[in-house]
Amino acid sequence: LKNYFDTKGKYYNQDNFFIFIPGKYFNYSNIAAGLAGYIIEIRTGKKLNEYSKHFIFNPLKMDNTGWFFSEINLANHSTLYNRETDTLKVIKPYGLTTYPDGGVRTSVSDLSKFFICLLNGGKNNGVRILKKKSVAEMTKPQFTEAVKPDNVDLVKRNEGLFWAFDNNGKRVGHTGGDPGVRTFMYYDTKEKVGIILFMNTELKEAELKNFRTTVYDEIFKYALTLRDNKTSR
């Protein structure tokens, strides 16, 4: 990170930075997420993986979750694929230099414990990992008509702290992708249901719109069916 941000660093490039003043233009930054992870390490004096394990993973019994290969059972790791035309190519497991931006390895079952905790104001099964006011701040829309980037349409999108509001503000959560991976974790604020979806094949950005109006919406419909039937899987 120092080599990326420092003007004398070997990874520094002025083209990596916008010329807009803060607040005038929105663009999600993985590097900024990595920087946030580093700030936690500086503030707490603990490595992010150790901090996460002590204050989040262990208390919530997320036993199949970790940042590094050494912290998980590799036998349970999904095989990742990359699409090349009409064929699938296996991708060997890989790590991320800026791992806080998306390198956590978990399961839907484990991540649901964290998601439920957030939806319950920072508490799950009697275990509190965040203050209510912290969760409220994280999930509060940060943009208003008075204060918003020029390239943001508030009817379609808003942002919390690492949380996005889409579908006209109806759904809040986060999505992301890397080679061989696409993930979704969203909560419908009107219907009061949430979904988590992991894919072990990369989803191209050009395919996202069609995916959201087909598979993504169908999964939410199925979640409503489970809720209405008072069943779970």
Predicted regions located by residue number:
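A small/polar active-site loop signature that marks catalytic segments
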Residues: 77-79
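Active-site-proximal loop and beta-strand segments within enzyme catalytic domains
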Residues: 1-30, 46, 82-88, 92
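Short, surface-exposed recognition loops and adjoining beta-strand edges that mediate ligand/DNA contacts
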Residues: 64-75
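Catalytic loop of the DD-peptidase/beta-lactamase superfamily, centered on the K-T-G motif
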Residues: 24, 41-53, 58, 91-233
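Well-ordered alpha-helical segments within folded domains of soluble proteins
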Residues: 32-37, 112-113
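Generic structural signal for secondary-structure transition and capping sites
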Residues: 10, 16-18, 61-65, 123, ...
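Glycine-rich, acidic and aromatic/proline-enriched surface loops and short helix-turn segments
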Residues: 3-10, 54, 58-62, 83, ...
